[in-house]
UniProtKB/Swiss-Prot annotation:
Subunit text: Monomer and homodimer.
Catalysis performed (reactions): GTP + AH2 + S-adenosyl-L-methionine = (8S)-3',8-cyclo-7,8-dihydroguanosine 5'-triphosphate + 5'-deoxyadenosine + L-methionine + A + H(+)
Cofactor detail note: Binds 2 [4Fe-4S] clusters. Binds 1 [4Fe-4S] cluster coordinated with 3 cysteines and an exchangeable S-adenosyl-L-methionine and 1 [4Fe-4S] cluster coordinated with 3 cysteines and the GTP-derived substrate.
Binding-site residues, GTP: 28, 77, 111, 171, 273-275
Free-text function comment from the UniProt entry: Catalyzes the cyclization of GTP to (8S)-3',8-cyclo-7,8-dihydroguanosine 5'-triphosphate.
Residues engaged in binding S-adenosyl-L-methionine: 41, 81, 135, 205
Keywords associated with the record: 4Fe-4S, GTP-binding, Iron, Iron-sulfur, Lyase, Metal-binding, Molybdenum cofactor biosynthesis, Nucleotide-binding, S-adenosyl-L-methionine
Species per Swiss-Prot/TrEMBL record: Rhodopseudomonas palustris (strain TIE-1)
Name the UniProt record assigns to this protein: GTP 3',8-cyclase
Record family assignment: Belongs to the radical SAM superfamily. MoaA family.
Residues annotated as domain Radical SAM core: 19-239
Enzyme Commission code: 4.1.99.22
InterPro entries found in the cross-reference section: Aldolase_TIM (IPR013785), Elp3/MiaA/NifB-like_rSAM (IPR006638), MoaA (IPR013483), MoaA_NifB_PqqE_Fe-S-bd_CS (IPR000385), MoaA_twitch (IPR010505), MoCo_biosynth_MoaA/MoaC (IPR050105), rSAM (IPR007197)
Binding site for [4Fe-4S] cluster 2: 268, 271, 285
Length: 344
């Protein structure tokens, strides 16, 4: 894959703004729906993935990302599925890194389960990636196997060590699960902070059928925070990324702890992001079914005029907030698509 064939981004006249005055400068792109784990809160064990022919090519993903950068996106995150299982994905990372060199892009980053990180960490750093988010819900090998079904904890920990050795900043993302890892949060926090890594806790989200009810997995993070406050001093931080996390400093560890609470605390008022699936569908809200097709305008012309207009139309339809709810009366997915398709 070469960047020479890709149309370079033009100068940004003005940033993209949605109907509620929010600047859209963060793009999350799922480059594959495939994953080498089958986490119990994410997908069913017998998950059927998209035919490979349905996915955008790496060149198309590059052109799509570049079109958003030309329209004011400053932060780009590659997700999945597990992005590092897509063949030749590093050629996409290397090509997109040209936008870092020109200053058109502030940050190129990745969310991963860590299983392939030992193999790719050094190359990611060489491409200008400065930090990665690693999804890790437990440090107990048996519980890790139960949650991921197919995962190997030692391999993930080796990936985290390789990332740190390569100079990548690592943040741990943990989904809190009732009766599973909820009592392990303090030790997970001490471990992460002890290695200089941030930890962000995430409530279960009602996305896609998983073969069981999410109400049996759901723990409100307000409860977890109250438990932590009994033994730790949590000081609210003003840090804002335009995203869903609210941060505290844990005085006893010196580390930062984030809470993503779509169900107990709506996080939509400052949303600055949109998501693109590996098939070229744009979702302007994680918690809505509404979507727009960007693959057709992408393939309809060699220049980006049609694509740019389609992006503008999609941003113009971004809703004010999500519709997530979990309770006994609403124990079905609020959104039918899985996070592995949308991009986690």
């Amino acid at each position: 894959m070469t960047s020479a064939a890709i149309t370079p981004p033009t100068t940004v006249d003005r940033p993209m703004t949605d109907p509620f005055g929010r600047t859209i400068d963060y793009l999350r792109v799922s480059i594959t729906d495939r994953c080498d784990f089958r986490c119990v809160y994410c997908m069913a064990e017998d998950m059927t993935f998209l035919p490979r022919a349905d996915l955008l090519t790496l060149e198309e993903l590059d052109r799509l990302c570049s079109a958003f950068i030309a329209k004011g996106v400053r932060k780009l995150r590659l997700t999945g599925g597990e992005p590092l299982v897509r063949r030749n994905m590093m050629s996409l990372v290397r090509s997109l890194s040209r936008h870092l060199k020109t200053g058109a892009l502030d940050e190129l980053t990745l969310t991963t389960n860590g299983s392939q990180l030992a193999r790719f960490a050094a190359e990611l750093a060489d491409c200008g990636v400065r930090r990665v988010n690693v999804s890790l819900d437990t440090l107990d090998p048996d519980e890790f196997r139960r949650i991921t079904r197919w995962g190997d904890l030692d391999r993930v920990l080796a990936g985290i060590n390789a990332a740190r050795a390569a100079g990548l900043a690592v943040k741990i993302n943990s989904v809190v699960l009732k009766g599973s890892n909820e009592d392990e949060i303090p030790s997970l926090m001490r471990w992460a902070h002890g290695l200089g890594m941030g930890l962000t806790l995430i409530e279960v989200m009602p996305l896609g059928e998983i073969g069981e009810g999410r109400i049996d997995q759901y723990v409100p993070l307000s409860l977890i925070r109250a438990r932590l406050s009994a033994n730790y001093t949590l000081t609210d931080l003003p840090d804002s990324t335009g995203g869903p996390a609210r941060y505290v400093r844990v005085e006893e560890t010196g580390g930062r702890l984030g809470f993503i609470t779509p169900l107990t605390h709506n996080f939509c008022e400052s949303c600055n992001r949109v998501r693109i699936t590996c098939t070229g569908t744009i979702h302007t809200c994680l918690g809505h079914e509404d979507a727009s097709d960007l693959r057709r305008p992408l393939r309809a012309s060699a220049d980006d005029a049609l694509l740019s207009a389609a992006i503008d139309q999609a941003i113009g339809s971004k809703p004010k907030g999500h519709d997530f709810i979990i309770d006994r009366r609403h124990n079905r997915p609020s959104v039918s698509r899985h996070m592995s398709v949308t991009g986690g």
